[in-house]
Regions:
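Conserved beta-strand termini and adjacent loop/short-helix elements that scaffold enzyme active sites
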Residues: 35, 89-91, 183-187
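Cleft-lining beta-strand/loop regions that shape enzyme active-site pockets
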Residues: 1-77
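Charged, glycine-interspersed solvent-exposed loop segments at helix/strand-loop junctions
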Residues: 2, 75-155, 159-171, 175
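Short, structured secondary-structure boundary patches
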Residues: 55-59, 72-82, 107-111, 178-187
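Extracytoplasmic
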Residues: 27-29, 41-42, 62, 81-84, ...
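Intrinsic disorder and flexible/low-complexity segments
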Residues: 115, 186-242
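Short glycine/threonine-rich loop-to-helix capping motif typified by GTGT followed
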Residues: 12-17, 151-154, 194-199
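C-terminal long alpha-helix characteristic of the crotonase
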Residues: 68, 126-130, 159-201
Length: 242
């Protein structure tokens, strides 16, 4: 099995669920190779680190082994931009600990930091196991640091520099296959169908941007943060190419 990873990361929970599936692949005895695309960062590397061999391009954004959590405080945004205010009634002092409409207090911040530290420890433990390194060695190149594919090769985060075809050929050789055909999953979406869906999505965004005007970007950013579930293992920035 060759897993193609082209991801800046995402939910720590989702990354761990996918990692477990890679562990089941290894238990089955099948060769498990990973080919990295433009990036395999944070959660993207989390799901790759368990592979028998990892291939990357020289410029693949690799690593960013780290975790962060964000609970946005939208109180002022909703009050000043949209005119929505909230009144809270609680059954205990921390019943609304994850509320988006107030800042975190000292105890809530401490609990959040503890949870993030636990997830980071689990992350580095898995990388150390998959890459046959000491956890202290992983920590020395982790903590959110980003590496190129070439640098990642030197520090042991990847095994080879090569594209997807090179990775597939190596996996086939490892499996003892002289003749094989590649099956890509999931199946490619029909281009016309994808175009129609994209146009429908763009229409909704266009209407919303006309209604909100200059507040649209702020709304879209708030919407993205609200929909993040739990601690995140992802790049600590968003790249926009213009």
């Amino acid at each position: 099995i060759v897993l193609r990873v082209n991801s800046p990361g995402g939910s720590a929970l989702a990354s761990d669920i996918i990692w477990r599936e890679t562990e089941l692949i290894k238990v089955s005895g099948k060769p498990f190779y990973v080919s990295m695309g433009d990036y395999a960062a944070s959660g993207g590397y989390y799901i790759a680190c368990n592979a028998d061999r990892i291939y990357a391009n020289p410029n693949t954004i690799t690593g960013s082994i780290g975790v962060f959590g964000v609970i946005p405080n939208l109180k002022e945004f909703l009050d000043q931009k949209i005119g929505i205010t909230f009144d809270r009634y609680e059954t205990n002092p921390h019943a609304d600990a994850l509320s988006l409409f107030k800042p975190l207090d000292t105890l809530e911040r401490s609990a959040m930091n503890t949870m993030i530290a636990q997830i980071y420890n689990e992350f580095t433990t898995k990388v150390a196991s998959g890459r046959r390194m000491l956890q202290s060695e992983v920590d020395s190149i982790a903590r959110g640091r980003v590496w190129s594919g070439e640098d990642a090769l030197e520090i042991g985060l990847v095994d080879e520099l090569g594209d997807l075809n090179a990775c597939v050929a190596a996996a086939a050789q490892k499996a003892g296959l002289t003749e094989y055909r590649r099956v890509d999953l999931p199946e490619m979406v029909d281009p016309l169908e994808k175009l129609i869906k994209d146009l429908e999505g763009n229409r909704s965004k266009t209407i919303l941007s006309l209604v909100l005007g200059e507040d649209f970007n702020a709304y879209r950013g708030a919407y993205d943060w609200i929909n993040m579930e739990g601690p995140q293992a992802r790049l600590p920035f968003i790249m926009q190419l213009r």
